[in-house]
Amino acid sequence: MIMDELWQTLRASELLVHQIDALTRLNRQKGLGQILITHTMKDLTLSTEQLSEIARGFLERSSVKYFGGLARNEMELLEQVLPLSQREKDLLVEWSAEGATDPRTGQSLPPPGRGRFMMKLGENAPGVPFKMNLTDTEHRIHDTNEAWVEAMARARA
């Protein structure tokens, strides 16, 4: 079971946190594997501390975790559920920077963290950074910036 954009589910009704919690606890009994995907730890901060604790438990109970770039102010929230070394935190923050503009061509450069992730197994093992390299076909299928690129091209014309 894959729950991408988990923040949307939690915003639809924070009480769904109880259903998701049950799934994370009973998934093996049901013969399910699961992947929960969201953007930031702030997505797991709900209207009450009790609901927020339940949501943070999703991460606490995950034996394998993948992180992309995160803002520096996310580190404190993340460390409430997972210890990170200073190097791991610095790397995640570095990856969150926006892309620059090439001064010679005026072209936008990709952000430094595009396709970069860190895998954490358990709590004490060091994070393993890696880069995803998409094929041309995968890039076309998963390009979420297409509308933005087209709008920028129209603006330049």
Model-identified regions with their sequence ranges:
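N-terminal helicase ATP-binding lobe
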Residues: 7, 84, 89, 97-105, ...
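Generic recognition of flexible, low-complexity loop/linker segments
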Residues: 22-24, 53-54, 91-95, 99-107, ...
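Conserved P-loop NTPase motor cores
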Residues: 1-91
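Residues that form generic nucleotide/phosphate-binding pockets
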Residues: 58, 81, 91-99, 151-154
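Conserved P-loop NTPase motor module
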Residues: 100-157
